Amino acid sequence: MYDSNTAATGERKHSDSRSVVSSPAPSKRVILTMGGKGGVGKTSFMLALAEWFQSHEIPVTLLDLDTENKSRGSLKHYFDGRVTKVNIHTAAGLDAFVDHLAEGAPIVLADMGASSGQVTHEWFDSMFEDVAATGLAFTAIGIVTPDPASVESILSWAARLQDRVNYVVVENAMTHQADFSYWRGSEQAKQFRTVFQPVVLMMEFRLPELENPARQHGVTLGQIAERRLKVPELQRASLVIRAQSYRRRLFEEIDKAKGLLLP
């Protein structure tokens, strides 16, 4: 559970570390989802983020680290040939981040699995200082829903990652009238926002008649909006316009965080 005293101690510790290790200005960035609770919409947001980069003609490397989600619903289910599946449950942990950045695009989008917390935290504890010294920055994406467990998951990750990452929190409205009172009103969430100043974005509720077949067939909002698919039920004029509207507004939200998404 998130603790403001722990956070303050962590901030001092990591700030002191950076004063000893002179880190260059970031030239590369890893954007990773904070795992923990599954089914909150992490992959849905990462799909939109990948299309946002694509719309700006910014090259990225897509990594699917969700080893439990083997087929439908995984990042690879949507982008397949563009996505590399990585098993982080090895002694090397998240070293794949460093290797892919050294070989390719300056930005990595990493969709983490629900059980990735311990591996991620241990890797940051052992590798962060040396990796940061090479000019690599990190942005952690947290997804909150009306379920308090989604909020607790983010607070737990933040208590371990501390200020070694920048934070973007996405309020995912999974119902038509979503209630985010726990995220917005709980004392621990307020402490998190005060200490780490996350950029908070909104991902609006999507009609089930669009969202469900899109997941089933592995198609993105962009593919629906631009009619780049062969799924009859998603070619209805109303759903095409809906997809265009959802994507436009979500891109506008992502624009608010671009300072934490680019190197």
Go through each PLM region and give its residues:
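Extreme N-terminal, non-catalytic leader segments
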Residues: 1-32, 99
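C-terminal accessory extensions appended to soluble enzyme cores
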Residues: 6-16, 152-153, 229-263
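Walker A/P-loop NTP-binding active-site region of P-loop NTPases
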Residues: 30-88
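Conserved beta-strand segments of the P-loop GTPase G domain that flank and frequently precede/overlap
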Residues: 63, 110, 140-145, 168-173
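Switch II (G3) loop of P-loop NTPases
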Residues: 106-123
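Inter-motif core of Ras-like GTPase G domains
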Residues: 121-147
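Conserved C-terminal guanine-recognition region of P-loop GTPase G domains, centered on the G4
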Residues: 128-129, 134, 148-167
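Beta-strand-loop-alpha "switch" segments that mediate conformational coupling across diverse proteins
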Residues: 173-178, 182, 189-245
